[in-house]
Amino acid sequence: MDKGKKVETVEKQENSLPWVEKYRPTTLDEVAGHEGVITTIKKFVEEGKLPHLLFHGPPGTGKTTTIIAVARQIYGKNYRNMILELNASDERGIDVVRDQIKTFASTRQIFSSGFKLVILDEADAMTNAAQNALRRIIEKYSAHTRFCILANYTHKLNPALLSRCTRFRFSPLKEDAIKHRLAHVIEQESVDLSPEAFQSLLHLSSGDMRRALNVLQACYASVDAGEQISEELVYDCVGSPRPADIRTVLQAVLDGSWESALHTFSYIKQSKGLALADMLTAFAVEFQKLDLQNKTRIALLDGLSEIEWRLSSGGNESIQTSATIGVIKQSMELEASS
C-alpha cells in the first residue's frame, strides 16, 4: 500500500472512532482521578508484584481504562497477545469459564516471560456456578496468570472470589477531573460549547466520564459546522428534563388549578419527549433546594417514590401524572398548615 494512503486510512479510522475510545488514556499517568488507587497500582507494577485485582464502582469511572493502561505498561506493544478480555454480561455461563478462560490461563506464550492477564468485565453478571469455577481456576493457574475482575456491585460476587483479590473502589469522578478531560477533547475537536451547556454537561454526567464524552459527541453530531451547542441541546441529547421546565411545572402545580396544572405538566412532558420517571427524579432534586420542614420533605419523597414504584410495576403514566400533582399539592398544604 502507498505510504500516503496508509496514513490517510489511519487518520480516517481515528476520526470514525467514538470519542470514548479515541481519547481513552493509554498510560496510568493519564487516568483522571483516583490518585490513591493509581499510586498503589503503579507500585505493584514497578515491583513486579501484581496481585489478582478487583476494581468495583459505578460505570464510566475508569475501571477498564486503568487495567488496560496497566497491561500496556507491563507488556508494551505485545499487550494484545498477553491479555484475554471478556465481558461477563454477554458471556456469563460456566462454559466460558471452562473453555475460554481455562484454555487461555493454562497455556504459556512462546518467547514471552512473566504472567498473562485475564480481564473480566461486569463479572457481577456471572452465574454462581461460573463464579465458583472461576475461583478454582484462579487458584490453579496463579503461577503464570493474573486476573482482574471488574464489577459495578461487589455484593453480587462470591465471597470466596472476593477474598482472592486486592480490592479497589472506583468512586464517581470529581467534577474537576471530568472538566479537565472534557476541555481537552473540546479543544482537540474544535467544539463550540456555550458555558451553560458545559456546566450542564458536567452536572448530567454524575461522575461518569463515558457518559460525558458520549453526550458531547452526540451534541456535536447534532449541530451544523460552526453552530454553538446550547444548554437545551445537551438536555435533549441526554433525555433529561431541563431545570427551567421542572420549575415551570412546579409553579403551575403550586399556583394554578388542578386542570391548568395537569395541562402544563402534560404539555411539557409530551412536547419535550420526557418520561415521567425522569421528571420524578428532577422534582426530587428541585425540592432539595427548597427550605422545607422535615415532615414535608418526607411526605414528598415518600409520595414520589410510591409513584415511581407504580410506574416500574406497569402503572398507567397518565394516572401517575395526576397522582404526582396530588402528592405535590398535598405536601405543600402540609407545609402551609404547620
From Swiss-Prot:
UniProt xrefs under InterPro entries: AAA+_ATPase, ATPase_AAA_core, DNA_pol3_clamp-load_cplx_C, DNA_Rep/Repair_Clamp_Loader, P-loop_NTPase, Rep_factorC_C, RFC_lid
Record: residues binding ATP: G57, P58, P59, G60, T61, G62, K63, T64
One GO MF term attached to the UniProt entry: ATP binding
Keyword ATP-binding attributed: yes
Principal place of residence: nucleus
PANTHER family hit by this protein: REPLICATION FACTOR C / DNA POLYMERASE III GAMMA-TAU SUBUNIT, REPLICATION FACTOR C SUBUNIT 5
NCBIfam families listed in its UniProt record: PRK00440.1 (NF001679)
Protein known as: Replication factor C subunit 3
UniProt organism field: Blastobotrys adeninivorans
